[in-house]
Amino acid sequence: MQYTHPVLHMEKVCRSYKAKGIKRNVLSDLSLDIHPQEIVCLLGPNGAGKTTTVKIASTLLLPDSGTVEICGVDAVRQPRKACEHLSLLLGGEDGFYLSASAVDNLLFFAQVSGVPLIKQKALINEALVKVNLFEVRDQPVRTFSRGMRQRLHIARTLVAQNSLILLDEPTTGLDPESASGVRQLISELRHVPSGILLTTHTMREVELLADRVVVIQDGKSIFKGTLEEMRNSVEINHVSTYLAHAVSEDQIKKLKEQVGGSSVEVLDKCDSYYIDVAWTVSVPNELDERMFTWKKVNERNPSLEEVYLGLLSGRRKKDER
């Protein structure tokens, strides 16, 4: 993929809050770039700084220090000018005039975004067709389901035709069918063409959409790269699944001491247990038969979720640190 200048450039961004007189660093020297026609997924545990990053990128928050540029515009010094180039979609269904129709809402946002009057009707109709809402365009938004409102949010970004799209957990709370439809629409936003920053907790979403991934923890970036680079960055060799009819706390404790606590997952299925063990090159890749009489039933490559958890627990390859 050929990249031009970034639509979003963040360099050494810091942000802190004060609560009860105590300063808490939320972002520490965070840097990232988003280019046209790519989707970058921002991952991290709750409280890692994902939403703060999106708010700073959207000019809703000012950084304490660092550089934020949107399409070359200094977003700290010229936030209004920078906003002309971006669309923000926060997880949830708010943000519309509920008593107004879908068309009237999009007309309002088109005017706010500075879309030329002569183009508004055609762009709105085209967007409503793409998100499968054209047939209900004249209905009040209050009659729309949560999934329909999320699709209307995406229609709003299509009408605005902005270079940067910020999506903060856009499929949160949606049923599987609605979430799948929203993911398909997000994938098609590449052709606008726009650069997209997407926060999510759903690894399936990352696998389907991400061109690159940024993982943050405690406000700091701990990984940047493609999905393949992410998979290759941890020490996890493979994952073995064992079947047991009884599991003691002592067994699990010993196993976690051997391979690390985040590398063991136990699933209780009534009269049996399935134990997933993520092995690394630095430990023996088999159980001690004197202590464990479990039966191995499967061996596979680590899932993206297991790779992600490995990153968070510090299990990166030494040459990647």
Model-derived features: positions:
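Walker A (P-loop) phosphate-binding loop of ABC-type ATPase nucleotide-binding domains
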Residues: 44-49
